[in-house]
Every structure is written in structure tokens, then in C-alpha cells.
Regions:
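Basic/polar N-terminal segments that are highly enriched at the extreme N-terminus
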Residues: 1-3
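Fe-S ferredoxin-like electron-transfer domains
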Residues: 51-177
Length: 177
């Protein structure tokens, strides 16, 4: 029998298997916590670097990325208060500033747009990336089509290539311009 941990999630006492993340527990209970760098599929490990899944943990000064944080016994987690939702909204707004408008995007149905909708964000109040700095679609290789205008530098595609497909043919470059 596996070990369990009891904690409070949005006012409800829940029991989770040790090793599960807050995001996994919430998702299993039908709660939707926005996420971008985490893919809930076999072989994909969460990294927590996009910060789109932030939640508040009682007694902690900073918000926590729910996709990498494991609940502890007696922990009180809040996913839907003003602080957590405001932080997630801010993250999405900052990311949208570096992307082309949805109408000009190569992939109008991208997960990023779904998460923007979920957070109630249709546009960013931050300065847009200059048109000349938005990467073009690269379909120069017969086996890969790279759409960097949708890139938020979360590393999901690199992890998928390296850890799931085990071929390590893509990487990150030019971050932090």
C-alpha cells in the first residue's frame, strides 16, 4: 500500500499519494489550474519554469508552482484566490507580449491561447515584441516544423525531444535577448 498525505485544497480536506504534485491532485479532482510548461502525459516531467500554475500555500511568503510542488501533511493550498489568479494572469500577459496577435499567429489553436482564455487574458498591457523580432516559421527540414513565434522558452519541446523521444536534436539558444 502506498503512503498518503492529507492536506487542504481550496477549503476541502483531500488525501493524495505521496509523490503526487499539487497540480496532479487538483487535476484529479476536476480543478483546472492553468499550465504551460507541464504536459500531463507519460514520460513528461514537470519543470515549473513558466510559472503559469502558481498557487498560494498558507504560511509561505511566495507562491509555488503547483506542477512541481508536492503537498505536505497538513498543508493548506489555495488555487483560486486573488493573489494566485492575479499572478497567473500576469505571467500570461507577459508571455503574450512576446507573441504575435492571435489572428497573426501560425497556430491559433495553441495551448497558450487556451490558457490565456482560461485566465481571462485577451491582450497584454506590456509592450509588444517588435515585429522584426518575432521569429518566422521554419519548415526547412523535412522531419521537423519549428514554430518559434509560439515559443515561451519553457523548455517543454526540448524535454520532449530529449527525454520522451530520446533523440536530443533540439536545444535552446538566444534566451534573454
Amino acid at each position: 500500500m502506498s503512503e498518503t498525505v492529507k492536506f487542504t485544497l481550496d477549503g476541502e480536506q483531500v488525501v493524495a499519494e505521496k509523490g503526487m504534485t499539487i497540480w496532479e491532485v487538483a487535476n484529479g479532482r476536476g480543478l483546472v489550474i492553468p499550465h504551460l510548461c507541464h504536459k500531463p502525459a507519460p514520460g513528461y516531467r514537470p519543470d515549473g519554469n513558466c510559472r503559469a500554475c502558481m498557487v498560494e500555500i498558507e504560511g509561505e511568503r511566495t507562491l509555488a508552482a503547483s506542477c512541481i510542488r508536492e503537498p505536505q501533511e497538513g498543508m493548506v493550498v489555495v488555487t483560486n484566490n486573488a493573489r494566485a489568479t492575479s499572478a497567473r494572469k500576469m505571467v500570461v500577459e507577459m508571455l503574450l507580449a512576446d507573441l504575435p496577435e492571435r489572428e497573426k499567429s501560425h497556430d491559433k489553436s495553441a495551448h497558450m491561447w487556451d490558457m490565456a482564455d482560461l485566465n481571462g487574458v485577451s491582450e497584454s498591457r506590456f509592450p509588444k515584441l517588435e515585429e522584426g523580432h518575432i521569429p518566422l516559421l521554419d519548415d526547412s527540414h523535412v522531419a521537423m516544423r519549428v514554430n518559434l513565434d509560439a515559443c515561451i522558452s519553457c523548455g517543454l519541446c526540448v524535454r520532449a525531444c530529449r527525454e520522451v523521444q530520446v533523440n536530443d536534436v533540439i536545444g535552446m539558444a538566444g534566451r534573454g535577448r
